[in-house]
Amino acid sequence: MTPEELALRTDLIEACRSMNSLGINKGTSGNISVRYGDGFMISPTGIPYDKMTPEHVVAMGWDATYSGDVVPSSEWRFHRDILQARLDLNAVVHTHSTHATTLSILGRDIPAIHYLIASAGGSNIRCAPYEIFGSQDLADRVLVALEGRRACLLAHHGVITGHVSIARALSLAVTVEELAHQYLMCLPLGEPSILSDSQVADVLVKFQTYGQQIRSGHVGLRQAS
C-alpha cells in the first residue's frame, strides 16, 4: 500500500466517522467513495465506522472487480457510475440525514430558498424517483438527477453529494441537510419565496472567487474585491 493510497483510505474512514459525529448519519448506514488509480475506493458494507481500518476500505475497478474478503458497500453501483460519468467529481458521499431524507419521502426537490443552494451547482437540488437500494435502476436515476448538479435527494432513501475531494463532498452533505432543514421549517408557514435563476447564477459566478484562492507571484499589498 503506497503512502498516497493509505492517506486516501484514512481520509475516507475519518469522513465516515465524521458523518456520524456531525449528525448527518447514524450507525453503519451511508457510504463514501473516492477516485483512485484506474477505479475507486469505497467504504465496506456493514462494518461499524469506529472499527474500520484502512484494510477494510475496498478498491474497485470500473468493471466492479475487487480483491479480498471485504465486501464493498451495496451502493457501489451509483458510486462507480457517478465517478465514471462525472470527471469533475473525485469523491461521493451518501447519507441518510434526517431533514434531507424527510424531504425525499415527500418527493420534493429543494428549491432556491437560500443562496447556498448554488453550492450544489444550480438553482435546485432534485429528488430522484425511488428505486430499491443497490440497484442499477437507482444508479441510472441518480445520474439523471445529478445532471448539472453536485447533489441530489433519493426518494424514500437519503442524499448524495459529490465534489473534488472527500472533505468538500462531506461539507456539501452538511449544507444540503441544513438547506433541507430550513425548507421544512418554512413549509408550515406557507411556500417560501424562491431566488430566481438569474440570482442563483450570480451566486455561482461569485463562488468562483470565494474562499482562499491560490495566487502565485503576488507580493505586497493587494486591493480587496
Give the label of every model feature segment.
Residues 1-225:
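Glycine-rich flexible loops
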